[in-house]
């Protein structure tokens, strides 16, 4: 409403469309928007401020009971079942690319990530880099608080986070509300915490490519070594994303793009992986993360363990997911 009163909105609608909307309808609309948090009023601002203050203390589980079990015993059984869904063996990872897609859609891809984690010695810390699905004030952000999981809180590595923040030309600890419902950290962290219960975590989100982040992480990793995890998904195709309903041709193109991207990363050639995508017509959402972490991916060779393009039947759309170890 841009600071205008309901009467002014009523007048503007009448001028533009010749329709006099009853004030009661406008009041009901404003109330509904306020309750949904879509209209910034004093009440909504106060609620957001309260949420932000809570997030500065801890990040609660948002998807427990929906995407994974809330209880530890059930969560352990969940991990075992997902590992069983992948029949192969893993390889030790210094860098791991894994999904953040709803686990039930790609169980064998998460299972491949668990197989890799089985072969990886427990790290002191995990650099978990996800994709921001909400706007950030800066190119990237971190939330230096415990993240709750069924296996107990994943504690932040504050010294490493502070060292990273000191090297960046922007404030790293920005936009805490962007972490409130961010599944690109919560879902991978469930699997990582289950496998490495003692590891500290650096929870990072990337909104736009940030070469500065990659360079700073390269420096910080020398003093604070750990496992680097890219929590990214691959192609997004179909009506949900602006395409026609999924066809064999579209699915083949999405798979070709996904595997070409992953295989070039596995050859230690991240620039070639990005160049292969061109304008990214199948909307691989890991592009900004990979572009930000180039210094950490160059000349690191590895192996693609799993890939799947998963159909979302109600919308005839599909999303790709993969697991890659470097």
Curated annotation (Swiss-Prot):
Pfam families xref list? Memo
Name-wise, this protein is: MEMO1 family protein TTHA0924
Which source organism?
Thermus thermophilus (strain ATCC 27634 / DSM 579 / HB8)
Q: Which family does it belong to?
A: Belongs to the MEMO1 family.
Gene3D superfamilies assigned: LigB-like
Q: Which domain of life is it from?
A: Bacteria
